[in-house]
Every structure is written in C-alpha cells, then in structure tokens.
Amino acid sequence: MPNDNRLAPAALAAQAAALPAAWRHVLEQPAVARAFASVLGHVEQRLAEGAVVYPAAPFRALDQLAPADVRVVILGQDPYHGPGQAQGLAFSVPDDCKCPPSLRNIFNEIAVDYPRPTRHDLSAWTRQGVLLLNTSLTVEDGQPGSHAKRGWETVTDALIAEVARDPSPKVFLLWGAHAQAKQALVPADAGHLVLAANHPSPLSARRPPVPFVGCGHFRQTNAWLQQRGQKPVDWSGEQNNASRQGEFAL
C-alpha cells in the first residue's frame, strides 16, 4: 500500500501559518500574499470537488531551514504526480518507492566522486542546508503541471529571491531550462555560485549544451563551500557517520 501523501483540506493554509518567521515574512508581501491566496482558493476548491492533490506537506522544504541556513539550492519544477511519491522535497521520494529516472541519474552523477546514495528520501540533504524546492508546490493526481499556472511561481520566485538576498555563501544548482530561468533571481554580485546543466531526466541528461552527465556539480559545490570555510555536503545522505566526512572533502 503506497504511503498516503494526499493533501488534506485546510492543511495548506495551516502549514503556511506554521512556517518559520523568515518564510512567513515572504508570504506576507502584498504581491506574494495575493498569489498565495489565489493558489489556496484553487487548491481548496479542487479538494472540495474531489480532486486528489499531492503532496501532504507542500511546504516541507522550508520547515527546517531559514534562508540563512540554506547552503545549496536545488530547484525542481513539479511534485511527482503519482500516489505515494511526492514528499514536498524536489526529486525526493520515500525509500520504499522505486527510484525515479531523474533521481537515478542524480545518484549516478554523485557516484562519480562519492559513495552512491542508498536512500531515495533526501531528508538528510535538507538537514545539511540543501533547499530542495519545486517551483510549483502542489499537483493533482496524474496531471503534471496542473497547478503550475495558479500562482505558485510568484510565491516560489519570492522565496528564491529571499534566499539569494541572504549574504551567507550559497550554491544554486540549476538543471534544465525551467530552473535556469530563475538565475535572474540571483544577483550577479551577491557572492553566490550558480552552476547550470541540463535536467537530469533521461530525455536531456546527455544532451548539449551542458549535459548533466559528467557535470561534476556535487564535487564543485563541496569544493566551493570548503573554500569559504564551510563543511562539505555529505551527498550519500549518511552525514551522521563522522568517520566518513573526509570522503566528501577536497
């Protein structure tokens, strides 16, 4: 039986209200508040009409991270639209789910330089300051992109811009044209690193202009962070094993 990851009525508003203050401040900006109200109204209407909406926790990517805690940003587009998949973290699925093709290619790229991750749930990355943010935070069952034009991008653009305004050094990993369009939200003089490549989907991972396969983003990210006095990210997801930390250093 798949994990029940359906969004419950009224849960979206409650989760937004429970976000850390730094994120709530973004949602309270007038233009963002209007966009979120539009999203919220549409989601609640669709739930009332019997639609199945995923995930159960749309704001999960923000729950444990304030903007100052973010060290790496990985942008996705749409939550997974099948039952038991989407968790509120871009690219992540529960461990008992089959590994999606894009995530498999991400793991293949990590394995070039580091131990291959064994868990499909990427929560361990989040605990290390990796923001796994989709640009649309809800989707209907079997209908990819179904909420993409309902106001979510105004909300998530504002969240990305807030992260980029924070002065602590961050790496933005922009995979595919959709994510790369968000580079405009990261000021060139902000002191952050932006790395771009094709999307890890099998349809594009090996294609020009910058194939995802062989991009080296995970090692480049760690090298850049360490040069600025920060710990490397344990991309294997086993950061609690201190004896392995050296495997992720330069």
Swiss-Prot record:
One MF term in GO for this entry? uracil DNA N-glycosylase activity
Q: What is its EC number?
A: 3.2.2.27
Cellular component aspect of the GO annotation = cytoplasm
Q: What is one Gene Ontology biological process annotated in the Swiss-Prot or TrEMBL record?
A: base-excision repair, AP site formation via deaminated base removal
- Top-level taxon in the UniProt lineage: Bacteria
* UniProt keyword Transit peptide present: no
Q: Which gene encodes it?
A: ung
Record's keyword terms, sorted: Cytoplasm, DNA damage, DNA repair, Hydrolase
Q: Does the keyword Hydrolase apply?
A: yes
Q: What is this protein called?
A: Uracil-DNA glycosylase
InterPro entries per the UniProt record, alphabetical: UDG_fam1, Ura-DNA_Glyclase_AS, Uracil-DNA_glycosylase-like, Uracil-DNA_glycosylase-like_sf
- A Pfam entry, by short name: UDG
